[in-house]
C-alpha cells in the first residue's frame, strides 16, 4: 500500500542531493576522535540512517511509515529499521518502497521508558537503542534516530557513541517556532546540573547549528534570565554571562526573558536543562491548547463557521508553525556520531523529518565544525 501523497508532501525535503551508494574498506578515527568511513571506490557515500523502529508511543507502525516516507522523498539515503524482525517486516509489507533503500536489522529487546537508563544500556545489549548506537560507533550508520527512552538515548549517546574530544557535556537542542521563524533551545533536557563552561560550549555548538543547518548568518545568542540586566539571575547565569560576553566565537546579545522567546528575541537560546525543558514543555502545551481552542471556537456558530472558511488559508499557515512534527527531532550535539531524539508520541511526518534532518547534519558536516570550534 503506497503512502498517501498528501501526507508524503508534508514531509519536508529541502536538502541538496549529493550522496551516492558506495562500499567501505574500514572504519577509522580522525585526529579529533571522530569515526569516519574509508571509501575504497573514491565516491561519496549514501547517507545511512539507523532508525529505532520499536521506540515511542506509536511504534512500530508510525516509525516504519515515516521511514518509508523519507526513503520515497530521497534516493540517496539508506535506512536501517532496527527492531523485532518479524514485527517490523510485517509493517513494511503495508508500504511500497525500494528494497535497496530500507533494511531491517533484528534487535530482540526494547528499552522501556520507565527502566533505569544506565542499567538498561548495560544489560539490554540487543535492544534497538543499543544496536543502533553501536552501528553509529562502528561506522555502519551515519546517524541514529529514536523516539524511545530519553534517558537511555542520553546515556547511550555518551557511553556507546562517545563525546567529541573537548566536549564537556552533550546538550539536546530542538528547534522551536517563533514570530520570526525558528530558534534553537539548548539545552532542553540533557544536563540539569550544568556549569558555566558547559553553557559556553552550548552557545558555540548552537551557533554552528543555526548557521549551517538553518542558514542564519551570525546568529544572535542569548541566555535565559529573569530580567535583561546583567546583574540579574541565579549563580549559574551570573557566572556564565561574562564568559559569554568575552567569547569571540559567538554573537552574544545578553539575557532573554521567557516572554521574548516566542517573538524571536534570539536565534540561540542558552539554558541549563531544567529551565530549557520547562520552556519546551510549556511551549508545546500552549501551542496544542491554542490550536484546540481555535478549532473549537470556529465551530460554535454558523457565523464562526463562515468566518473560519474566509480565514482558513492564513490560519492554517499560522497554526502549522506550532506543529512540532514540522521541525524533526532534537539532536544530541557534541557526540562522535549523529544522534537525534524525536518526540515519544511522534507520528510518520515527524519521523520522516527527523530522518531528513539527519541527512542535513551529515551534509553540512556539523560534528566536524563543532570539533574545529573547540
Which residues does each predicted region cover?
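Glycine-rich phosphate/diphosphate-binding loop of Rossmann-like nucleotide-binding domains
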Residues: 61, 78-80, 86, 192-258, ...
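Phosphate/nucleotide-donor binding subsite
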Residues: 97-141
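Glycine-rich phosphate/nucleotide-binding loop
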Residues: 158-171, 175-185, 265-269, 273-374
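Short, Lys/Arg-enriched N-terminal segments with co-localized hydrophobic residues
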Residues: 29-45
Amino acid at each position: 500500500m503506497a503512502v498517501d501523497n498528501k501526507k508524503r508532501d508534508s514531509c519536508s525535503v529541502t536538502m541538496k542531493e549529493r550522496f551516492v551508494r558506495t562500499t567501505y574498506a574500514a572504519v577509522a578515527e580522525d585526529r579529533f576522535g571522530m569515526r569516519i568511513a574509508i571509501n575504497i571506490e573514491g565516491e561519496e557515500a549514501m547517507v545511512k540512517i539507523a532508525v529505532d523502529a520499536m521506540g515511542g508511543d506509536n511504534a512500530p507502525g508510525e516509525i516504519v511509515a515515516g521511514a518509508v516516507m523519507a526513503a520515497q522523498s530521497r534516493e540517496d539515503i539508506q535506512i536501517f529499521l532496527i527492531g523485532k524482525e518479524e514485527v517490523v517486516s510485517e509493517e513494511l509489507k503495508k508500504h511500497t518502497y525500494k528494497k535497496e533503500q530500507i533494511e531491517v536489522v533484528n534487535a530482540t529487546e526494547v528499552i522501556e521508558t520507565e527502566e533505569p537508563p544506565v542499567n538498561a544500556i548495560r544489560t539490554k545489549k540487543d535492544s534497538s537503542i543499543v544496536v543502533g548506537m553501536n552501528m553509529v560507533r562502528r561506522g555502519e550508520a551515519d546517524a541514529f534516530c529514536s523516539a524511545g527512552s530519553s534517558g537511555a538515548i542520553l546515556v547511550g549517546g555518551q557511553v556507546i557513541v562517545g563525546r567529541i574530544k573537548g566536549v564537556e557535556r552533550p546538550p539536546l537542542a530542538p528547534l522551536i517556532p517563533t514570530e520570526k521563524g525558528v530558534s534553537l533551545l539548548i539545552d532542553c533536557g540533557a544536563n540539569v546540573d550544568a556549569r558555566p563552561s558547559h553553557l559556553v560550549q552550548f552557545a558555540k555548538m548552537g551557533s554552528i547549528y543555526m548557521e549551517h543547518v538553518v542558514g542564519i548568518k551570525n546568529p544572535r545568542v542569548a541566555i535565559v534570565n529573569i530580567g535583561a540586566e546583567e546583574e540579574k539571575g541565579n549563580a549559574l547565569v551570573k557566572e556564565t554571562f561574562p564568559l559569554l560576553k568575552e567569547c569571540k566565537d559567538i554573537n552574544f546579545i545578553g539575557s532573554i526573558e521567557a516572554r521574548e522567546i516566542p517573538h524571536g528575541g534570539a536565534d540561540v537560546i542558552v539554558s541549563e536543562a531544567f529551565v530549557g525543558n520547562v520552556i519546551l514543555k510549556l511551549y508545546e502545551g500552549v501551542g496544542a491548547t491554542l490550536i484546540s481552542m481555535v478549532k473549537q471556537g470556529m465551530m460554535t456558530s454558523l457565523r464562526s463557521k463562515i468566518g473560519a472558511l474566509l480565514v482558513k488559508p492564513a490560519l492554517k499557515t499560522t497554526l502549522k508553525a506550532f506543529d512540532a512534527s514540522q521541525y524533526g527531532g532534537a539532536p544530541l550535539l557534541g557526540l562522535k556520531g549523529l544522534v537525534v531524539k524525536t518526540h515519544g508520541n511522534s507520528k510518520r511526518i515527524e519521523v520522516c523529518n527527523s530522518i531528513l534532518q539527519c541527512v542535513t547534519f551529515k551534509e553540512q558536516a556539523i560534528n566536524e565544525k563543532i570539533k574545529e570550534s573547540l
